[in-house]
Amino acid sequence: RVGASVQSPFVPTLRLDATQPLGETIAALNKFQPEALVAYASVGRLLALAQLEGQLEIAPHSVFTSSEVLTEESRSLIAKAWGKPPMNVYAATETATIAAECEYRVGMHFFEDLVITEVVDDQYRPVPPGEYGEKIFVTVLFSRTQPLIRYEMSDSIRLTDEICPSGKPYALIDGIQGRHEEVLHLPTPSGETVAIHPNVFHDVLDLIPTGGWQVILEPTGLRLLLVGVRNRDDELKLLSALR
C-alpha cells in the first residue's frame, strides 16, 4: 500500500491528502503538532509560507521533502520557517527510498545495500558522473513480494565523484532534474527545437510571491497562469525574468 512504510502502530502518524484545501491541511497540522514533517517539495514550500505568515504554528524537529525537485528557493524558505534546512529524499512508490541527504547536504547518498541504481542515456548506455542521464534502472534487493529487476524510471539525475564529508562510502547524486517526459521541446525561429526543463520555470516563478502558477503548452506557444500576483511591480519583475 502506498505510504505503508511510514505507518506504525508505535508512532502517531497523520497522513494528509496533498490535494485538499490548504486551510484544512493547516488546521489539521496545528491540531496534530507533528515532531517530523514529511511533504512534497511544493507542499513544503506552501506550508513554510503559511508558517512565516502566522497561519501555521508547528515546531517540527525534522523536515523531509520528497517526490518533487527541491529548488534552492524552497529549501531556503523551509529553513527560514523552521530554523533548519529540509532533508531531501529521493524515492518512488515502486522502490521505496532510493537515496537521501545526510546532515552535510552535499548530495543524496544511494541506499546501495537496498537498491542497485544505474544511470543511463536514451540508448541505455551507462552515463558517467558529472553528466545527466535520460533515465535510471533500479533493482530492488529487499522485496520478496514483487521483485523489481532493472526497473526503468524516466528520471534525469546526475552522479558525482565527490566524497561526502561524512565519510559514507555510498555514491552521491548531486543533481535531479525530474522526469524526462516533463521537458518541453519548443520551436526556435531558425526551425530547430530547444528543450526547456520545468526547473527553468521554478527558478523564475518561485521568486515571485504568487498563490500558485501553471504553464500550459499550446500549439502556438506557452500560456502562463498565475494566482494571486500582489502588485504591478511583481508582474513587471516576472516578465523581465522570463524574457
Over which residues does each language-model region extend?
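Active-site glycine/GP-rich loop and adjacent strand/helix microenvironment
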Residues: 2-243
